[in-house]
Amino acid sequence: MAAPVDLELKKAFAELQAKMVDTQQKVKLADLQIEQLSRVKKHANLTHGEITSLPESTRMFEGAGRMFILQSKGEISNQLLEKQKTADDKIKELEQKKTYLERSVKDAEDNIREMLMSRRAQ
């Protein structure tokens, strides 16, 4: 009778360990992506701040591969604001994903603890 219980617990622990390793990797990846997006947002914010102090008649060029494209100050400003907004949205999405992953691991741990307690009670 004890052998099936032990096998069941071993299987549950193995699944939890695999899930935790996978989740920890995903959380680290999400942290790296959040960090990178924060740098992109900060760069766009600083660039936008510098551009706003320039007069409207200033010629501005956007880098596109090996060439530069002449654009108006308004277009570049709009692109930078859009880049900031996109980075903000992605950061929020990654934070939610990270929270979900951490919660799912905690739930799995709680389930195994509950299983252990019920086995000990028997």
Swiss-Prot record:
GO terms for molecular function: protein folding chaperone; unfolded protein binding. Pfam families: Prefoldin_2. One of its GO terms (cellular component) is cytoplasm. The keyword Chaperone applies. Gene3D superfamilies: 1.10.287.370. The keyword Chaperone applies. Keywords: Chaperone. Heterohexamer of two PFD-alpha type and four PFD-beta type subunits. Binds specifically to cytosolic chaperonin (c-CPN) and transfers target proteins to it. Binds to nascent polypeptide chain and promotes folding in an environment in which there are many competing pathways for nonnative proteins. Belongs to the prefoldin subunit beta family. This is Prefoldin subunit 1. It comes from Danio rerio (Zebrafish).
